[in-house]
């Protein structure tokens, strides 16, 4: 099915009691790993770039072109959305212009009325080009590209107002955070999520900070209305651990590898790529989106 807007497959997840994964990429290798995992599991997927990752990769146009061409060259058949994660207003508009098929405008750091007004503007522009829109109310804990949130519970009335702007799916704070969860984390506020989904019945909710949340809590959140779960830190840890292990083994057994040119980055990065693919496949299974393409 190739490159598509995320609206239909996220809504299908909401209606059928599973969630799709929004997996952040940081380079060519991660993008390949995510695509391989999605194809192997026959799962729809959003490949996401944060503002920082896009800058690192050479800009939004480079990211859009990379993902689009890999989908074609790798023969990917599952639905893939190219999604901006936590974008400022100008970044959201740029991504719409260069060919992203889904964007998140994050105005959660703005006064509520300004957030709503700017979101409505983004929705009008995006929908005119068939681009799906995610927005946020409350703030997600942790730090994302310099935006620091304390992990608020999204106000119900603000969530209802945000849905009325015409967005396609809503990120709302329910005690979740970006990055590793501390030992004293109290868990998702599932009672608040239940109130939230009752206020916007049938509307897809997005769970940010999906890495490190116990599987039973994720599954209960999906049962209550979460239809998209974002994952980044988990993939980063998997990649880092596998790459470090490869380096340790190489240094300890250098003679064994003599002549194999393992200094070649294509070989050096391979274990990390495989680890990311494995992590993504495992999350797809937990989210219930395998064989939903």
From Swiss-Prot:
Keywords: Glycolysis, Lyase, Metal-binding, Zinc. GO terms for molecular function: fructose-bisphosphate aldolase activity; zinc ion binding. SUPFAM superfamilies: Aldolase. Dihydroxyacetone phosphate binds at residues 179, 209-211, 230-233. The active site is at 85 (proton donor). Its EC number is 4.1.2.13. Pfam families: F_bP_aldolase (PF01116). It is an enzyme of class 4 (lyase). Catalyzes the aldol condensation of dihydroxyacetone phosphate (DHAP or glycerone-phosphate) with glyceraldehyde 3-phosphate (G3P) to form fructose 1,6-bisphosphate (FBP) in gluconeogenesis and the reverse reaction in glycolysis. This is Fructose-bisphosphate aldolase. The gene is fba.
